[in-house]
Amino acid sequence: MRVGILSLMQESNTFIQNETELNHFEEDLLLEGEDIRSTMENAHHEIGGFFQGLRDQKVEAVPIFTARALPFGTVSSSAYTKLIERMFFLTKKAGKLDGYLVAPHGATVSGEYPDVDGHWLHKLRQRVGSGTPIIGTLDLHANLSLQMVEATDALIGYRSNPHLDQRDRGVEAAEMMVKMLRGEINPCQKAVFPPFIMNIEKQCTTETPCKELYEHAEKLRERDGILSISILQGFPYADVSEMGSALLAISDGDDGSAEKVLEELSEKLWNSRSQFDGAGVDLETAMESLNEITGRTCLLDMGDNVGGGSPADGTLLAKALMTHLVERSFVCIYDPYATELACNAGIGHSIMLQIGGKTGSDNGTPITAEVKVRGIYSGKFEEKQPRHGGFSSFDQGKTAVVENNSGLTVMLTTKRMAPFSLEQLYSCG
């Protein structure tokens, strides 16, 4: 048996003015054929899980196309057209396959296609026909659509946020594919779409209220005939009609068991919905709280979420830390121009910089400050442990670490980087 592997992943923030272009995929992952195997086979990613699951079952994996970009604005129409044309050219070139393992994100948006994932999955189904299995994974933040459900035999969502189980879900999808091809199971997929969206502040799966919801799902997963249950939290930064939380269940045969567990799980979600309201505080309150806290403290600007597509050059927290003279404070800001100026000045030299706030005023205006250059780095680092997003190799571009006499240290980067790994800090001293 031969099973193809396809992936197109990007989390689209529709509130960002700039679009995600083809070069953003090239800077992250844009791979074809055996390059996918050599790059992803051992990764903490569902594609790595696809390879492992098929290999364990002695089924041939046929890697076809993989594209991934860091969360940012919507994918430009030209970029999406080029990506999908290449994907289906390579799919045709791969010849007859017994099934397809797919890894969409679930919250990708592009111009006339607010449901990119559903669009390309539907096109794949049209091309391969109803008799060829299509089984895949979804990011836990997917905005599930009926089109995605109808185009596939089974979709399996991550079970953890931060996303540490991507490889496991890939293995699970591959095992389900092989069992289906061997006639051992007959997956029947059902979904419900409650009128609800989880506040992103409350989406950690190891803390209340998500913890209890996911524990309940684990119990339901043990029911006879249930192959998979997924809680898709949704991505609130994609302002599309599909935006919202959804539940998926896959049963072995259409015996009503999937509908039953979905009814129970959706009832529990709905009855606890008030617990998912955000509890954020204003910036001044956050600063004042530092006077009462000892030890390390992490301040989160929920509107400047790089992992959710923000520009990464927000300055509101940095300005507040400087104003309040918070010693030994630290921020990371994407600013290629300021980084180059700091690198040109050299380690140990002081320079006046305008830092951040260059992509728009929503997340603050530039900071004008005199800083001393403490270090200059390549910006490349590796992570050996499973981390959110399945990344293992990182490149935030040339990096400069500078310090202001207020006590603030700033890591300046030439590429946007979400805080997925502590190696980002360790690699820069």
Model-inferred region functions:
Residues 55-59, 63, 89-100, 286-297:
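Glycine-rich phosphate/diphosphate-binding loops that line cofactor/substrate pockets in enzymes
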Residues 181-210:
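Internal, active-site/partner-interface "lid" segment
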Residues 408-429:
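A C-terminal functional module that forms or caps the active site or interfaces directly
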Residues 4-11, 15-16, 30, 77-84, ...:
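Active-site histidine-anchored catalytic micro-motif
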Residues 30-32, 63-72, 103-105, 265-273:
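Gly-rich Lys/Arg/Thr-decorated short loops/hinges at beta-loop-alpha junctions or inter-strand turns
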Residues 1-56:
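N-terminal amphipathic/basic leader segments beginning at the initiator methionine
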Residues 65-86:
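Charged, often glycine-rich, active-site loop that binds/positions anionic groups
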Residues 201-407, 411-415:
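Hard-cation-handling environments
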